[in-house]
Amino acid sequence: RDRIRINGDMISKDSVSEFMNDNLDFFKSNNLSFFEMTVGLAFDYFSNNKVDIAIIEVGMGGRLDSTNIITPVLSVITNISIDHTKFLGSNISDIAKEKAGIIKKNIPVVIGETQDEIKSIFIDASNAKSAEIVFADDFIYDNYDCDLKGNYQRKNMQTVLKALEILQQNDYKINDGHIINGLKKVSLNTGLKGRWEVIQNKPLIISDTAHNTAAVSYTHLRANETSS
């Protein structure tokens, strides 16, 4: 339930139960994965509640992910690192090609971090789809406060701010107050835990969900800065 929220509130147990009961035969006959069922649940819930805008996160990769059936108003690709190699490929270029699979015809795409070895993959994919492409780290933004304190969140914030700027250009009514308020309540609105989360100060205990080499390196760097 914590994966599906509207304005920070989790989907109700009744909504989950009703959806599962209505679609269980279909799930069984099509041998859907847990994630695929969850995606269907999210789409159904957002549609029934007539949300103004939905943020849909890819489960793994992009090209073949079950979320990729939608046509978004904006696509966002964060930094690329080695992960899920059994399914996405053993090198960063192969993984980037899978991620680039979410780029849609005439739909703008924000790339969160410029990585020289794969930059051309995203440019070629966007050109093939006539999609405007921007690299978020080419821009400088005001320093906003965020309740997620890991150093790596600076890059994430830069990506978010560029994405919001594009939405503003497409007539979405987002002002600076909305941005300030939203960034201060990321954990509350999303339920995210373990992002350089201070559990205790004396002694200092920190929880971080770093789960691949790149993420661990960021966490290790922040830990060294904290202890120095």
Question: Which residues are covered by each model-predicted region?
Answer:
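Short catalytic-loop micro-motif centered on adjacent basic/acidic residues
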Residues: 33, 109-112, 206-207
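Residue-level detector of anion-binding/catalytic polar loops
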Residues: 52, 108, 132
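Nucleotide phosphate-binding/pyrophosphate-handling subdomain across enzymes
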Residues: 48-49, 53-58, 66-76, 81-84, ...
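Aromatic/hydrophobic pocket-lining residues that form π-stacking "cages" and hydrophobic walls in ligand
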Residues: 42, 122, 219
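ATP-dependent carboxylate-amine ligase catalytic core
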Residues: 1-70, 88
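Conserved catalytic-core segment of NTP-binding enzymes
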Residues: 62-64, 71-129
